[in-house]
Amino acid sequence: MESTEKLTDTNAILAYLYETFPLCFVAEGETKPLKIGLFQDLAERLADDSKVSKTQLRVALRRYTSSWRYLKCIKAGAVRVDLDGNPCGELEQEHIDHAQATLKESQDKAKAKRAERSKDEGDAADKAPRKPKRKPQPQARRDAKPAAKDKPKAAPKAPAVPINLVPAKLEELKVAQRVNVKLGMSPVAGSIVDINKGDVHVQLDSGLTVKVRAEYILL
């Protein structure tokens, strides 16, 4: 004899009721108010059905009748039905008032939970470490000139040059020779680092290297 698997999940039991009693239990859309004492009828009709137990049927029925969809159908003029969809009398005002109060309470609780969840998410976002804002520089610092360390070093003063310097001849010059270069009004001391044809490369004492013709070299 094949054993029948018992349904334990409430959603699966509701799906079974939708299929077995489609005129009573509505899967989608507007539901119908159920007959008072329907659980007893349901237990008797499914007494030999090994798929469901009375306990699970009670849980499934409670979920069905506490849903917003069901509570909204409890209104004036609605008629209760039995397992086969047969009418079993109109709703009493007391039951309508109770259903509306239950619906409002449930919706208010859901709204409060959503608000609390949004607040918690907002608090979590506020507590998350944020990148510190860059402190604005004072106007005086923004307008200040670059630091002295970024400037090229001032050229040291050239040593006093004798007044009897004369232009050199190319053949008199050699690498590493100390010479003076005529730059502007005053000669500047330096050392020859290279001689290429008629051009003489001189590294001045300031660190600057210049290329001049031999006639600008003073000895």
Curated annotation (Swiss-Prot):
Subcellular localization: Cytoplasm
A GO molecular function held by the record: RNA strand-exchange activity
Keyword entries, A-Z: Chaperone, Cytoplasm, RNA-binding
Biological processes per GO annotation: post-transcriptional regulation of gene expression
Cellular compartments per GO CC: cytosol
Gene3D superfamilies reported in the protein's UniProt record: ProQ/FinO domain
Bias kind Basic and acidic residues: ranges: 105-129, 140-153
Coiled coil: none
Region (Disordered): 102-160
InterPro entries, per database record: ProQ, ProQ/FinO, ProQ/FinO_sf, ProQ_C
A Pfam family per the record: ProQ
PANTHER family the UniProt entry points to: RNA CHAPERONE PROQ
Similarity field: Belongs to the ProQ family.
Function: RNA chaperone with significant RNA binding, RNA strand exchange and RNA duplexing activities.
Protein name as catalogued: RNA chaperone ProQ
